[in-house]
Amino acid sequence: MKILVTGANGQVGWELARSLAVLGQVVPLARDEADLGRPETLARIVEDAKPDVVVNAAAYTAVDAAESDGAAAKVVNGEAVGVLAAATKRVGGLFVHYSTDYVFDGTKSSPYIETDPTCPVNAYGASKLLGELAVAETGGDWLTFRTTWVFAARGKNFLRTMLRLAKEREEMKIVADQFGAPTWARSIADGTAHALATAMRERAAGAFTSGVYHMTSAGQTSWHGFADAIVASWRAVPGAAPLAVSRIVPIPTSAYPVPARRPANSVLSNEALKERFGIELPDWRYAVGLCVRDLLSQ
């Protein structure tokens, strides 16, 4: 099986190169090889490679920048995704895509399920919803996995930012009234590999159905709780460099103004993923501990 992975240098893409290798030949494509900012170049790449699977891990992820650069976000997260999905259909392949909790408005009091109405509250979320719709409209075989609060030992993410600040500051003020499930990029990649193995068996048996599924860590917390766990995990590792921070202060969203509005509730239900694919991602606290150790080992 030949698997094309776009966004191969990103947090999830980097992990996919490892997790998908057990399923077949992985062809990782970095941005300079498959630039979603240039949708007109993408169909040729897929059609020339003729993969069995295309996994799109590339995205425009600058949430605040998207408020003033919405056109670029729509091209990368919307138009380009549709081009990739359509090209994958033409070569008879399966298209796998990632989306976000930000397609919801965050007003629900319980975890979101896949069929809840979408209502993005920022430009980034709107662009990701465009991508979801573009994939579905191709009529091909596809899977879209929505995830939340992605972190990794590499790249730009909340975990790495918190550790940098914790080394520099005695006090950090972190938002405590937004809730979600911090999800390790490695967990997403491993979950994708398991789901893909099942999906390919279903396709071979003529029993495959396309759909959207939520794929996040077990459990939930606030950004403040996430930051607290990151610092605690670092300090729990023998020999880890000392951190300057002594106080992590909870603050409301209103005390940390940013260009893009964030959903208050980003918790997604993973029950549909478990039911179809038998997948349960580890608890977010456990994943944070493993990721911190991974970072320290580099």
UniProtKB/Swiss-Prot annotation:
Cofactor names: Mg(2+)
Residues engaged in binding NADH: G10, Q11, V12, D35, L36, A59, Y60, T61, Y124, K128
Signal peptide residues on this chain, from the entry's feature table: none
Pathway membership, UniProt: Carbohydrate biosynthesis; dTDP-L-rhamnose biosynthesis; Bacterial outer membrane biogenesis; LPS O-antigen biosynthesis
Catalytic activity, as annotated: dTDP-beta-L-rhamnose + NADP(+) = dTDP-4-dehydro-beta-L-rhamnose + NADPH + H(+)
Entry annotation: catalytic residues: Y124
Keyword field: Carbohydrate metabolism, Lipopolysaccharide biosynthesis, Magnesium, Metal-binding, NAD, NADP, Oxidoreductase
Recorded GO MF terms: dTDP-4-dehydrorhamnose reductase activity; metal ion binding
Keyword Transferase: no
EC number: 1.1.1.133
Cofactor binding comment, as recorded: Binds 1 Mg(2+) ion per monomer.
Coiled coil: none
Annotated positions binding dTDP-beta-L-rhamnose: T100, D101, W149
Keyword Oxidoreductase carried by entry: yes
UniProt binding sites for NADPH: Q11, V12, D35, L36, A59, Y60, T61, Y98, Y124, K128
InterPro entries: dTDP_dehydrorham_reduct, NAD(P)-bd_dom_sf, RmlD-like-bd
GO CC terms of this entry: cytosol
Alphabetical GO biological process terms: dTDP-rhamnose biosynthetic process; O antigen biosynthetic process
Pfam families with a match to the protein in the record: RmlD_sub_bind
Family designation: Belongs to the dTDP-4-dehydrorhamnose reductase family.
Binding partners and assembly: Homodimer.
Role: Involved in the biosynthesis of the dTDP-L-rhamnose which is an important component of lipopolysaccharide (LPS). Catalyzes the reduction of dTDP-6-deoxy-L-lyxo-4-hexulose to yield dTDP-L-rhamnose.
Name of the molecule in the record: dTDP-4-dehydrorhamnose reductase
Record organism: Burkholderia thailandensis (strain ATCC 700388 / DSM 13276 / CCUG 48851 / CIP 106301 / E264)
